[in-house]
């Protein structure tokens, strides 16, 4: 029994402290963030699971921003990102690695084992707008 308590105490002592970070897509991208990216005020995001991803969708009229989040290693992320609709090209200055896909309709970002994908429908935000929403989300990751 003492040995078990010692092991438990040791594990607790070396375990990292919990941080305020999240992988909830509706927490990573707020309604304010989504509204700025879409150019319209949006309500609360709709959280759901889409296949391997946790998702959050913000919509107003025909404008939609969907945020997809999953845990993934870098090599698999790169391979997956390059399979998106062309053109697919790297975007510097976001996370550890990022790609634009589908003529700017999607931004795929990888940081420390987490993929965050942003898909835009009904709006064609400039790259800087995409970077702004991505960097805001990554600060919360």
Predicted regions located by residue number:
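Short, solvent-exposed recognition patches
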Residues: 36-104, 111-112
């Amino acid at each position: 029994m003492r040995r078990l308590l010692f092991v438990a105490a040791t594990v607790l002592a070396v375990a990292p402290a919990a941080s305020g970070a999240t992988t909830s897509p509706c927490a990573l991208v707020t309604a304010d963030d989504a509204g700025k990216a879409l150019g319209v005020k949006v309500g609360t995001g709709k959280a759901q699971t889409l296949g391997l991803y946790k998702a959050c969708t913000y919509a107003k009229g025909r404008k939609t921003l969907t945020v997809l989040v999953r845990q993934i290693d870098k090599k698999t992320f790169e391979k997956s990102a390059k399979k998106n609709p062309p053109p697919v090209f790297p975007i510097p200055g976001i996370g550890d690695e990022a790609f634009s896909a589908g003529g700017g309709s999607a931004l795929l970002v990888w940081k420390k084992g987490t993929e965050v994908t942003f898909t835009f429908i009904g709006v064609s935000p400039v790259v800087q707008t995409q970077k702004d929403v991505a960097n805001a989300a990554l600060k919360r990751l």
